[in-house]
């Protein structure tokens, strides 16, 4: 990797694996852009754009948003977001082999190929316990958990004091659909990046500080 303050990576893992906890750590450490497709989609939904309305309908049913929507949104970020000049942490993308191939092609054309794909690995049973208690501060995307990471004041954001919400797709049935979709569509991505030689796996059932240390170790940055 080019310098200690630069990174171009993909963060892979099922819903609730801790991507939302670790990505800000990576963003701060490497001064890179955290490109979270979930946050981008929720921003589009909040603005009521056509893309947002289409995405909300799919997400509320526990499905995954189409390749075309995702590819166009990511390409726009990589082209127009100044923070991407110091690198980027892609979170929630790519989810499929066609997306991974399109991403690789685009990044190679721009002379900024991926350096690492880190997979956060967790058992489904633990994910269910983690995710069904998750609370979100909509304006910032900060996440809490009723059991594992509660806010200082019940149902209030630590920073602003504003109300927290439980996401509408954070219920058991929708979660099972999301995990089934994740396993079916995303696990081939791991094989794809293993073949290209940039994959590394991290046990994400460990405490967050241990997971962070492991990530830095896999990146060769500890």
Swiss-Prot record:
Residues 2 form a propeptide. Coiled coil: none annotated. InterPro entries: Adenyl_kin_sub, Adenylat/UMP-CMP_kin, Adenylat_kinase_CS, Adenylate_kinase_lid-dom, AK2, P-loop_NTPase. It is found in: Cytoplasm, Cytosol; Mitochondrion intermembrane space. One of its GO terms (cellular component) is cytosol. One of its GO terms (biological process) is ADP biosynthetic process. Residues 133-170 are annotated as: LID. It catalyses: AMP + ATP = 2 ADP. Residues 36-65 are annotated as: NMP. AMP binds at residues 37, 42, 63-65, 92-95, 99, 167, 178. HAMAP family: Adenylate_kinase_Adk, Adenylate_kinase_AK2. Belongs to the adenylate kinase family. AK2 subfamily. NCBIfam families: adk (TIGR01351), PRK00279.1-2 (NF001380), PRK00279.1-3 (NF001381), PRK14527.1 (NF011100). Consists of three domains, a large central CORE domain and two small peripheral domains, NMPbind and LID, which undergo movements during catalysis. The LID domain closes over the site of phosphoryl transfer upon ATP binding. Assembling and dissambling the active center during each catalytic cycle provides an effective means to prevent ATP hydrolysis. Catalyzes the reversible transfer of the terminal phosphate group between ATP and AMP. Plays an important role in cellular energy homeostasis and in adenine nucleotide metabolism. Adenylate kinase activity is critical for regulation of the phosphate utilization and the AMP de novo biosynthesis pathways. Monomer. This is Adenylate kinase.
């Amino acid at each position: 990797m080019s310098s200690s303050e630069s990174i171009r990576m993909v963060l892979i893992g099922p819903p609730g694996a801790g991507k939302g906890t670790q990505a800000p750590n990576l963003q701060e450490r490497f001064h890179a852009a955290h490109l979270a497709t979930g946050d981008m989609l929720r921003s589009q939904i909040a603005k009521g754009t056509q893309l947002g309305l289409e995405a909300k309908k799919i997400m509320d049913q526990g499905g995954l948003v189409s390749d075309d929507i995702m590819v166009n949104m990511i390409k726009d970020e990589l082209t127009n977001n100044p923070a991407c000049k110091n690198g980027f942490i892609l979170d929630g993308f790519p989810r499929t082999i066609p997306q991974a191939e399109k991403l690789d092609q685009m990044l190679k054309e721009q002379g900024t190929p991926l350096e690492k794909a880190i997979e956060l690995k967790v058992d489904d049973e633990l994910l269910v316990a983690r995710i069904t208690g998750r609370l979100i501060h909509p304006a910032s995307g900060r996440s809490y958990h009723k059991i594992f990471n509660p806010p200082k004041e019940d149902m209030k954001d630590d920073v602003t004091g504003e109300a927290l919400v439980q996401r509408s797709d954070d219920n058991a049935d929708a979660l099972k659909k999301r995990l089934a979709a994740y396993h079916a569509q995303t696990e081939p991505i791991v094989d794809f990046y293993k073949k290209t030689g940039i994959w590394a796996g991290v046990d994400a059932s460990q405490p967050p500080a241990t997971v962070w240390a492991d990530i830095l170790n896999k990146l060769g940055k500890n």
